[in-house]
Amino acid sequence: GCTCPNIDGTCGYGGCIYCSGRGSGDFAPAPLQTVTAQIEAGKRQLAAKWQSDRVIPYFQAHSNTYGEIDRLRAAYFEAIAYPGTVGVSIATRADCLGGDVLALLAEVSAMTHLTVELGLQSASDETAARIGRGHTYAAFCDGVSALRRTVPAADICIHIINGLPGET
């Protein structure tokens, strides 16, 4: 599993107010397992509800483009190689989309369908400071623009939280 620059001290400590200690991955398989083992555990967990050999591995908890590029590449490629994989979904922060990461995401996008989920939560910098997000709306927009330019085939999902204190 990855961590987050808003946890390890790069831009903050303790994370955003809405993230748990597991980085909002409370229902995900244990991150110490291999990617393959996590996919298989997830399939078992969902088997009662959905019967399918197709999977979209979801890198959810914390910031999944934040880490050593070779480790990220190995994790993404292991997921892509899993039998029945029809795409990959990667949740992260817009301020965790540096040049090496964008190049890697372009590689992933050339191999399979890619969705990148970006946590915005609020476009208000005042609210962002209150919830401890650790980056500005302008930084978010810069990250989205860079992602769209570099990986045009990727779907982008933006997470927002309606009704945050002080917003209407």
Model-identified regions with their sequence ranges:
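Acidic (Asp/Glu)-rich catalytic clusters
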Residues: 46-50, 76-83, 105-113, 145-149
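SEC14/CRAL-TRIO lipid-binding/transfer domains and related phosphoinositide-recognition modules
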Residues: 1-5, 43-50
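Canonical Radical SAM [4Fe-4S] cluster-binding loop centered on the CxxxCxxC motif
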Residues: 1-34
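Distinct, well-ordered alpha-helical segments
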Residues: 69-77, 98-107
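Short, surface-exposed connector motifs at secondary-structure boundaries
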Residues: 82-88, 153-158
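Core AdoMet radical
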Residues: 22-39, 46-69, 83-97, 113-140
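Conserved strand-turn element in the central/C-terminal portion of the radical SAM core barrel
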Residues: 125, 147-168
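Aromatic/hydrophobic pocket-lining residues that form the small-molecule binding cavity
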Residues: 72, 140, 168
